[in-house]
């Protein structure tokens, strides 16, 4: 089974009290517009998404291009889902330097129950792998923290947040018939390189 882990596109910022579930920004929608063509050569048979809007809105064009429905699985939600506000990672450095430093060192935010989060992510990936046929290609639309946890579990990295996972990046995994996972590519961004915030300075 082939599994694509796609991070959501650039979302709007939410304000305190609005929750951590914003829609995509205009820039994010431009990023998403490139995904169907970028993934066209792969025989995607199933599209699964986090319940958060920024992930669903990233998944929808890919599913529509194949006549598939977007399946929602709460377990693919990011660690921030219950927070009162969403702040894009690029802004955290200036607004919360202490939390930024913690994340830059590879740790989840201080408010996150790491064991519970890792267990949730591990369970949903195991479920996707065990319910898929060997020939299936599944595209999961999720979040940077979730994707890092998956890679951490497979590769045994020293830190949970070991990889930079860009907006609309594609991480590709393969699962053997026995369920053994291997990492093929991480954070593929060729299709949106020029639209990423870090490349527009």
Question: Which ranges hold each PLM region?
Answer:
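Active-site-proximal alpha-helix that buttresses catalytic centers in soluble enzyme cores
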Residues: 2-72
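Generic beta-sheet signal
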Residues: 3, 136-142
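Short active-site segment of divalent metal-dependent hydrolases/proteases
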Residues: 11, 146-147
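Generic structural signal for well-ordered alpha-helical scaffold segments
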Residues: 33-40, 118, 122-130, 151
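Short beta-strand scaffold positions
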Residues: 49-50, 119, 141-142
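Active-site signature of alpha/beta-hydrolase-fold catalytic machinery across serine-
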Residues: 61, 149-153
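Phosphate-handling substructures
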Residues: 65-123
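Acidic, low-complexity terminal tails and accessory targeting/binding regions
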Residues: 68-72, 78-91, 130, 134-136, ...
